[in-house]
């Protein structure tokens, strides 16, 4: 069997770059960020995917233009794409995190996941260590990666400007507050706990894990390898993967750079196949016709051609090249 995998198509930001699928019946996994709002996500999924599973990214439910909390937006997707339907929305918060691929022994375990904020790049760790030496000399408490990463996330991600959750201080349950990194960490802990349980309970199955956030620093592009923001995109879960050989593949998104790699001696597959933002020309090698061959647990592809998309890309590139000299 072949399972198609792609993510981060961002149809709202990429509205000038039309993308639709012809082979809508191919079994497909989409690890998040179809759109910047859940109604747009639902509409595109219904029109293009007739067989598969998907999860929310940080964008799909984060933007509060509907006045809904993140949870209400996930509930909206869960109602329209139930467990017993041909296309299923998965998330720990809606009580649906696992489903068997029809006619196979493959169990998909899926949820947004979020991040534990523990990962820190070697360069950033050196900077933190140097700063802590001086802090201790001044009699101050040292800083730790998790708290630094959370502070960096608040400054660097729009999630914490636009996403909302219920305000716990309001006894009537009417008020909302902005989501914060502590919420993401809490959701990560709940999701990872359930994920670990499902993996342990299904040793007899081949498991594909689907998350929006990445499970290994190998997914970080070389241009961002020293970024202070990396903990907002990845958690280092390689030991969890290698300790559980029934995890055959992990599909993810979020980082807007294509990664197809393996971890461990058993070659457990990591697949990150995001489209990213067309205006930034992030993933020029993006191919939505990317598949996991479940007989070999290797990647297979076939050529992707779209005259409408190619024409839009050419128009944008020509316009960019015409105006670029004025900004140099």
Which stretches of residues belong to each language-model region?
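Binuclear metal-dependent phosphoesterase catalytic core
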Residues: 230-248, 256-328
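Active-site-proximal loop/helix segment associated with metal-binding centers of metalloenzymes
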Residues: 107-207, 213-224, 321, 326-328
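Active-site neighborhood of phospho(di)ester-bond hydrolases with catalytic His/Asp-centered motifs
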Residues: 5-7, 28-33, 52-58, 88-93, ...
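Active-site environment of divalent metal-dependent phosphoester hydrolases
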Residues: 10-17, 35-40, 59-66, 94-99, ...
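Beta-strand-turn-beta hairpins that frame and shape the catalytic cleft
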Residues: 1-4, 95-110, 204-206, 262-269
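N-terminal active-site segment of His-dependent metallophosphoesterases
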Residues: 1-54, 60-69
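Glycine/small-residue-rich loop that forms an oxyanion/phosphate-binding "nest" at active or ligand-binding sites
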Residues: 64-95
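Charged helix-capping and loop-helix junction motifs
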Residues: 70-74, 226-235
């Amino acid at each position: 069997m072949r399972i198609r995998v792609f993510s981060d198509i961002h149809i709202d930001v990429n509205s000038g770059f039309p993308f639709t699928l012809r082979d809508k019946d191919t079994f497909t996994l989409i690890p998040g960020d179809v759109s910047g709002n859940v109604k747009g996500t639902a509409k595109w999924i219904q029109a293009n995917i007739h067989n598969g599973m998907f999860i929310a990214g940080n964008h799909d439910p984060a933007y509060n233009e509907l006045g809904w909390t993140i949870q209400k937006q996930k509930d909206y997707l869960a109602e329209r794409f139930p467990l017993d339907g041909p296309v299923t929305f998965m998330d720990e918060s809606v009580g649906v995190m696992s489903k068997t691929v029809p006619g196979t022994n493959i169990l998909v375990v899926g949820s947004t996941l979020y991040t534990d904020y523990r990962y820190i790049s070697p360069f950033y760790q050196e900077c933190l260590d140097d700063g802590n030496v001086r802090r201790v000399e001044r009699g101050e408490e040292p800083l730790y990666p998790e708290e630094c990463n959370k502070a960096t996330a608040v400054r660097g991600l729009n999630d914490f400007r636009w996403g909302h959750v219920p305000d716990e201080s309001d006894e009537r349950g009417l008020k909302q507050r902005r989501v914060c990194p502590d919420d993401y960490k809490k959701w990560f802990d709940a999701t990872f706990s359930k994920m670990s349980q499902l993996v342990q309970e299904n040793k007899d199955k081949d498991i594909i894990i689907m998350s929006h956030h990445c499970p290994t620093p190998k997914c970080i592009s070389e241009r961002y390898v020293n970024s202070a923001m990396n903990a907002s995109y990845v958690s280092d879960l390689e030991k969890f993967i290698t300790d559980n050989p029934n995890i055959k593949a992990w599909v993810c998104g979020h980082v807007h750079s294509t990664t197809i790699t393996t971890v461990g001696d058993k070659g457990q597959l990591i697949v990150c196949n995001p489209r990213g933002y067309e205006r930034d020309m992030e993933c020029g090698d993006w191919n939505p016709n990317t598949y996991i061959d479940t007989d070999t647990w290797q990647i297979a592809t076939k050529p992707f051609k779209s005259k409408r998309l190619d024409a839009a890309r050419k128009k944008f590139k020509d316009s960019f090249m015409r105006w670029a000299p004025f900004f140099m």
